[in-house]
C-alpha cells in the first residue's frame, strides 16, 4: 500500500483536488498475525494530512474471514490411471472451490486421522518436478519417500481437480482432507453445478463439539431450477 500510494500521488496527484473519495481497494489482511497495523495507521494518517478534503476508503475484504473456517472433505475413492493416483473427494473444486481453478488460490491442505485426531500437512508439487518412470507413467512415490496423489472433485467436470500433492503416508478411504482458510471463498462462490450440493455449514466449539447450522439437500437445487 505504501508503494502504491507513492506511485498514485506521483502519477495522479494533480487531480486529487478534484475528487472527494479515494478507494484504496481490498486485499489488506490486517487480521494476519504479522500485519503491521500501526504502520498502516501512520500511512493513512499521513495521506489524510496531505489531502484533508479526501474521504479515504479501505476495503479489508477477506481480513474479516481470514483463518476463520476450513472446508472438510473425505476420501471416497482412489483411482489409478497411467500411474497417477487420484483421490476422489466428496467435495468439488469446480463447485465449492472455484478460486483454486481460476486464480489459482492454493489453500493449505492437511489430513486428519479420525482415530487419534493427529494431523499432517501435504505439500504442493509442481507437475514438471515429478520424476517419470517412462514417457507415460509418473512415480507414485516422491524422491523423499512420500506418496504422491492428485486431488479430484466429485462433479462430472473433467477439469475438477487441483494438481499433485505429496503426503507422508498412503491415503485410505474415509480419511479426512482439510482445506484451510476456505470459508471466505466457499460461502460466496459455491454453486450447484449438475446438482452437486453445497457443503454443510457448522461451528466447531472449543470443547470439540460440532454444531450443524445448515445442511443442503437435492430440494435446494431443485427449488433453484423451478
Cite the ranges covered by each PLM segment.
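Active-site loop/helix belt of alpha/beta enzymes
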Residues: 1-82, 194
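Charged (often Lys/Glu-rich) extended helix/loop segments that serve as interaction or gating elements
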Residues: 43, 55-226
